[in-house]
C-alpha cells in the first residue's frame, strides 16, 4: 500500500528530470514538426539517460524532501533488477507488464523519497538474513571440516595399506630374483665341472662350449662308454666260459686271415668281428684260466684278476 501511494510523487520526480534533459538536448537537435516534447508522459524513458551529465541547475537544487545532503533525482544510476516505475505500476494494477524492447535492465533510476522506502530496507534485511544464514552455516561448516578430516584419515589409511602391500610385493620379487640367481650360478658351476671331464680339446684357443653343446657331447660320450662296456662284458663272459671254436667251423679264407693275424700278434684273434668272439685255430686250446691269461698277455690285468686270486 505504501508503494502504491507513493506512485504520483515518484512519477513527478521522474518526469521533471526527463524534462530537464530534454531541454538540454533541444539546443543540439531540432525536433521534427510531428514530434511534440511537451508531453513526456507518452514517451518511454531512454536507457542512456542515466549516463548523461545533469544540468548545473539540477545539481544545485535541494534533494527530495528538502534534504540538502540528498542527491537530486536522476543523479544516481545503479544496477537494479527492474524499473521502479514499472514495478510500482505492476503492483498497483495487480498484473505484470512485459519489459520494453529497448531497455536492457542494466541502468535504472533509483528515486529516493522523503519517507523510508521499503525497498531500501529490503537489501539490509537480506543482508541480515544472509548474515544469519552465514551464522547458521557455521556449525555446518564445522561439520564439513570434520567430514573432510574423516575423508583425509580414510585416504591416509588407504595410502598406508597400499604402501605396505607394495613393500611386501617388492620383498617377494627380490627373494624370487635372488633364488633364480643362485640357481643359475649352480647350473653354471655344474656345466663347468662337466666340461672338465668330457674329453675334448681343452686349450685357450678353443672356444668354450655352450650349454647345449656340452650336454650333447656328454650324451655321446656316455653312449660310447656304454657300448665299450658292453663289448668288454661279452669278452669277459667268453673267457669265463672257456669255449673254443675249432678251425673247421670257419671258412678257409677266414681261417687263413686268422692264422696270419695270430702269427703277427697272438692277441688280435680275440678281437675279430665274428659272432661270439671266436678264437683262431692257430692258437692252442686253453682249458684253464691261467693259460687263457697267458695267451692274452696284452689285455689289461684286471681281466685276469680272478685267475690271480685263485689258489
Swiss-Prot record:
The GO annotation for biological process reads:
axon development; positive regulation of transcription by RNA polymerase II; sensory organ development
What InterPro entries does its record include? bHLH_dom, bHLH_transcription_factors, HLH_DNA-bd_sf
Q: Ranges of Low complexity compositional bias?
A: 81-96
- Tell me the ranges covered by the bHLH domain, including all copies: 171-225
Keyword Aminoacyl-tRNA synthetase present in the record's keywords: the answer is no
The alphabetical list of record keywords is: Nucleus, Repressor, Transcription, Transcription regulation
Q: Which GO terms describe its molecular function?
A: DNA-binding transcription factor activity, RNA polymerase II-specific; E-box binding; protein dimerization activity
Fetch the PROSITE patterns from UniProt: BHLH
Q: What does this protein do?
A: May act as a transcriptional repressor.
Protein's recorded name? Class E basic helix-loop-helix protein 22
What would be the name of the gene that encodes this protein? Answer: BHLHE22
Amino acid at each position: 500500500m505504501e508503494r502504491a501511494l507513493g506512485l504520483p510523487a515518484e512519477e513527478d520526480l521522474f518526469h521533471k528530470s526527463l524534462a530537464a534533459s530534454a531541454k538540454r538536448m533541444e539546443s543540439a537537435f531540432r525536433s521534427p514538426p510531428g514530434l511534440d516534447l511537451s508531453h513526456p508522459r507518452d514517451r518511454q524513458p531512454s536507457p542512456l539517460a542515466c549516463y548523461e551529465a545533469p544540468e548545473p541547475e539540477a545539481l544545485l537544487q535541494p534533494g527530495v524532501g528538502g534534504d540538502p545532503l540528498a542527491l537530486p533525482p536522476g543523479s544516481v544510476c545503479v544496477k537494479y533488477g527492474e524499473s521502479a516505475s514499472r514495478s510500482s505500476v505492476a503492483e498497483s494494477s495487480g498484473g505484470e507488464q512485459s519489459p520494453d524492447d529497448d531497455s536492457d535492465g542494466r541502468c535504472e533510476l533509483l528515486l529516493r523519497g522523503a519517507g523510508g522506502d521499503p525497498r531500501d530496507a529490503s537489501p539490509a534485511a537480506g543482508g541480515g538474513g544472509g548474515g544469519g544464514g552465514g551464522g547458521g552455516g557455521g556449525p555446518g561448516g564445522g561439520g564439513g571440516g570434520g567430514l573432510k578430516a574423516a575423508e583425509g584419515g580414510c585416504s591416509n589409511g588407504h595410502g598406508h595399506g597400499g604402501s605396505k602391500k607394495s613393500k611386501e610385493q617388492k620383498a617377494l620379487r627380490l627373494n624370487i630374483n635372488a633364488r633364480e640367481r643362485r640357481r643359475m650360478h649352480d647350473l653354471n658351476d655344474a656345466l663347468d665341472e662337466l666340461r672338465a671331464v668330457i674329453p675334448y680339446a681343452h686349450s685357450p684357443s678353443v672356444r668354450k662350449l655352450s650349454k647345449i653343446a656340452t650336454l650333447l657331447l656328454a650324451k655321446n660320450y656316455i653312449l660310447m662308454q656304454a657300448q665299450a662296456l658292453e663289448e668288454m662284458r661279452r669278452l669277459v663272459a667268453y673267457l669265463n666260459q672257456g669255449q673254443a671254436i675249432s678251425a673247421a667251423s670257419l671258412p678257409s679264407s677266414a681261417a687263413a686271415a686268422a692264422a696270419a693275424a695270430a702269427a703277427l700278434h697272438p692277441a688280435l684273434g680275440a678281437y675279430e668281428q665274428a659272432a661270439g668272439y671266436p678264437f683262431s685255430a692257430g692258437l692252442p686250446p686253453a682249458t684253464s684260466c691261467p693259460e687263457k691269461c697267458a695267451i692274452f698277455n696284452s689285455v689289461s690285468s684286471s681281466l685276469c684278476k680272478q685267475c690271480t686270486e685263485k689258489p
